[in-house]
Amino acid sequence: MGGLCSRSSSVNNAPGGTFAHVNGHHLNNNASDLNSHSGESGLKDDPSPVTENVDDNKHTSESFSFPIVSSGSHPQNIEDGIPRLSRVLSQKSRSTKSRQAAVAKVSEVSSLLGRAGTMGLGKAVDVLDTLGSSMTNLNLSGGFSSATTVKGNKISILSFEVANTIVKGANLMHSLSKDSITHLKEVVLPSEGVQNLISKDMDELLRIAAADKREELRIFSGEVVRFGNRCKDPQYHNLDRFFDRLGSEFTPQKHLKQEAETIMHQMMSFVHFTADLYHELHALDRFEQDYQRKIQEEENPSTAQRGVGDTLAILRTELKSQKKHVRNLKKKSLWSRILEEVMEKLVDVVHFLHLEIHEAFGGADPDKPANDPPINHKKLGSAGLALHYANIITQIDTLVSRSSTMPASTRDALYQGLPPSIKSALRSRIQSFQVKEELTVPQIKAEMEKTLQWLVPVATNTTKAHHGFGWVGEWASSGSEANQRPAGQTILRIDTLHHADKEKTEAYILDLVVWLHHLVTQVRATTGYGLRSPVKSPIRSPNQKTIQLSSGSHNPSMGLPLLTTEDQEMLRDVSKRRKTPGISKSQEFETVAKARLCKHHRLSKSSSHSPMMGEMMKNKKDTFSTRRPSSVPIIDFDIDRMKALDVIDRVDTIRSL
């Protein structure tokens, strides 16, 4: 307190008996008495005069910490009659309160550490975690208050990641609305895809849906925690401990829903401007590159052209206008917002979403796992096969819709992408496949459509879900209308192949592939052309009957297009490269290599010095004709285009089963 009194005496002991200005005048009356009074209070270091004055005026509130002095006491109070603040008592009151709070906090910490020392290492870790999470309460404001004492930084370049997180929260909030929950329970869960691939038990499906929403909330809150750790204000640090305590709080708060909706609407408006800023920054970068390139062209006399100066002036004007537009967008978007202000709103949104999930799926037990651990590995999502199986289903649907004009590359890609379990079971299923009566092509497609009509939408949702939010800024193109989607349009994980049973899905795919093989057989039998069955490879037989394509097999009434010149040349080249049965690959390679190497070739410089090379080149045609008599079939170009393509693809043979 000595220091505080010294500061007070230094103010009161003005040199020459002159006091501070009061209404613009110096007070010099009774200088000797005043100096003696001030010197007494300063030298004795005794606050008793102030204390007596306070005791005489007990009716004055102690919180203001100043005495009311009568008009005749001191001359400095005569002019305006306004009470003056006593610095000694004010600072004494504040220091006393802060010292008491500090003593209480230290005693609490010491008691915690004392208990930790007596309970062992494990308990000490828990106590230290509790202590660390309570350190944010050391500030006087306490809680998540908007009137923060620490001035935070602007979000700036981090605004795109913050916008990405806000869109995730908006999507989750939209999926928890009453309309979306009604759509989930009445449309999604009873659908054929969910019932056939996941489960027919509605309670289990509700538990799965609730677990998905909690997982989305965990991801969203994790990003909020990451942004909170970047704040200057320490009360937003380690928010994960605060969110963990929310797990046991399910008290509904009516006002919180309205506040959360208002907050999200406000933040989504910032997200829209941030999305525009994202695109305009890319445009600004292009303008700057064009401007710099024009400057280089103008400085280089060899590449200088007429009108470059005018073009440069136009680019300079556009660049200046674009920079101004970007500055305006930065002011309207999240770029210029304070991170602490946004964090305060995001914390409220996390709290609201936690309560909404509990209200929407209150009947689903969160502690009971949606799937038993022994069978969890049989789900496509946990096995990482959901997207791959979705692509297979999409390819099958494409082949069925274009069964007569599908290129061979797509057919081969389908077979190569089949899982090993389907490939191993495919041969026996095709051999045992029997139909009671011969079905036409439309009838076969109708049978396949019974499965494809509910399986293809699930595969499509899987592909869309995997392509969402893969990188920062994707929300700028697709996520900005998240709050404008109608109910039921948000893709739910339960409506994809993520939770689909692996064995059930493979059984449906195998059935579709077998029907596809039967469809191809019927198409080829009725039209004489079409798809090569994508399942032909595993049932090849060494006993093959080769049928030469001749002009007699062509049906002129079909009106199919003839071969073009390029197709004829390609067909010749493929026919020349046909392998001869009974000749190994090494022998065939040697024959072709000898036929191609000549003395004019760059890699055969010593050919003119070899006597055997000249003899070989002399008898080249005879060797080719004697060793490969059946390798060049008679090509009849008066055939339809599809049959010629089958010859090119080497599918012009009928292979016995």
From Swiss-Prot:
<keyword id="KW-0519">Myristate</keyword>
<feature type="region of interest" description="Disordered">
    <location>
        <begin position="1"/>
        <end position="80"/>
    </location>
</feature>
<dbReference type="GO" id="GO:0045927">
    <property type="term" value="P:positive regulation of growth"/>
</dbReference>
<keyword id="KW-0217">Developmental protein</keyword>
<dbReference type="Pfam" id="PF05003">
    <property type="entry name" value="DUF668"/>
</dbReference>
<dbReference type="GO" id="GO:0043434">
    <property type="term" value="P:response to peptide hormone"/>
</dbReference>
<dbReference type="GO" id="GO:0006109">
    <property type="term" value="P:regulation of carbohydrate metabolic process"/>
</dbReference>
<dbReference type="InterPro" id="IPR045021">
    <property type="entry name" value="PSI1/2/3"/>
</dbReference>
<keyword id="KW-0449">Lipoprotein</keyword>
<dbReference type="InterPro" id="IPR021864">
    <property type="entry name" value="DUF3475"/>
</dbReference>
<feature type="lipid moiety-binding region" description="N-myristoyl glycine">
    <location>
        <position position="2"/>
    </location>
</feature>
<keyword id="KW-0539">Nucleus</keyword>
<protein>
    <recommendedName>
        <fullName>Protein PSK SIMULATOR 1</fullName>
    </recommendedName>
</protein>
<dbReference type="GO" id="GO:0005634">
    <property type="term" value="C:nucleus"/>
</dbReference>
<feature type="compositionally biased region" description="Polar residues">
    <location>
        <begin position="62"/>
        <end position="76"/>
    </location>
</feature>
<dbReference type="Pfam" id="PF11961">
    <property type="entry name" value="DUF3475"/>
</dbReference>
<feature type="compositionally biased region" description="Polar residues">
    <location>
        <begin position="26"/>
        <end position="39"/>
    </location>
</feature>
<dbReference type="InterPro" id="IPR007700">
    <property type="entry name" value="DUF668"/>
</dbReference>
<feature type="compositionally biased region" description="Polar residues">
    <location>
        <begin position="1"/>
        <end position="15"/>
    </location>
</feature>
<comment type="function">
    <text>Promotes seedling growth probably via the regulation of phytosulfokine (PSK) signaling; PSK are peptide phytohormones acting as growth factors. Together with PSI2 and PSI3, required during vegetative growth and reproduction. May also have a function in carbohydrate metabolism.</text>
</comment>
<feature type="compositionally biased region" description="Polar residues">
    <location>
        <begin position="540"/>
        <end position="556"/>
    </location>
</feature>
<feature type="region of interest" description="Disordered">
    <location>
        <begin position="534"/>
        <end position="559"/>
    </location>
</feature>
